[in-house]
């Protein structure tokens, strides 16, 4: 099987969401889903709001990134999470 690298864009619900705590939660979530977190970064958006990007490495399988994306969207302090880049290694 091939290895997949995905870049997931995560939008927090508000600027008050603690950035470092959110990053740590996302890392733990990725690892609980049998994947590796290859990096977490953030970029400022506007008015104190920021976007978090998570790089995920996993083996290609049925359903792909759907379980991880759904789990991220289910987090209390996450407005949205979506895969913005996907490539095979």
From Swiss-Prot:
Keywords: Elongation factor, Protein biosynthesis. GO terms for molecular function: translation elongation factor activity. The keyword Amino-acid biosynthesis does not apply. It comes from the Archaea. Transmembrane segments: none annotated. InterPro entries: eEF-1beta-like_sf, EF1B_bsu/dsu_GNE, Transl_elong_EF1B/ribsomal_bS6, Transl_elong_EF1B_B_arc. Pfam families: EF1_GNE. The keyword Protein biosynthesis applies. Belongs to the EF-1-beta/EF-1-delta family. HAMAP family: EF1_beta (MF_00043). Promotes the exchange of GDP for GTP in EF-1-alpha/GDP, thus allowing the regeneration of EF-1-alpha/GTP that could then be used to form the ternary complex EF-1-alpha/GTP/AAtRNA. This is Elongation factor 1-beta.
